[in-house]
Amino acid sequence: MASNTSFLFATIAILLVLNISGRTLPETEDSTNIAARLNGGGLMECWNALYELKSCTNEIVLFFLNGETKLGVDCCQAVEVITTDCWPAMLTSLGFTSDETNVLRGFCQSPNSGGSSPAPSSVKL
């Protein structure tokens, strides 16, 4: 009985080894090169937009408090990149409400954005 069990175990082990060694793995040229991954676009673009958003935080606060302050082009581009190309809920995780995020996104996507129209006053802090 012990020889049957060990034969069965050995057969299953050999079949598993043959199955694993026989499959092809996908090519991963750039996955080991961290510089290529970081310069590839997406991740760095999100970090740059987040850094730009940090520099225009005062502008965004005044945008909501005064209702007449205009957002700059760079600030709107950062909001656009973060909400469309990165994680859409990132602004919410940074402390903005979903209503404030929608107002910012709507203002920056409007044709008159970038400092040429007054801010909407629908969101109150």
UniProtKB/Swiss-Prot annotation:
Q: Which UniProt keywords apply?
A: Cytoplasmic vesicle, Fertilization, Secreted, Signal
Q: Give the signal peptide range.
A: 1-22
Cross-referenced InterPro entries: EC11-15, Prolamin-like
Any single biological process term in GO: regulation of protein localization to cell surface
Annotated tissue distribution = Restricted to female reproductive tissues, specifically accumulating in storage vesicles of the unfertilized egg cell.
- Asked if the keyword DNA-binding belongs to this entry, the reply reads no
Name a Pfam family for this protein. Answer: Prolamin_like
Question: GO cellular component terms?
Answer: cytoplasmic vesicle; extracellular region; vesicle
Q: Which family does it belong to?
A: Belongs to the plant egg cell-secreted peptide family.
> Could you identify this protein by its name?
Egg cell-secreted protein 1.2
From what organism does this protein derive?
A: Arabidopsis thaliana
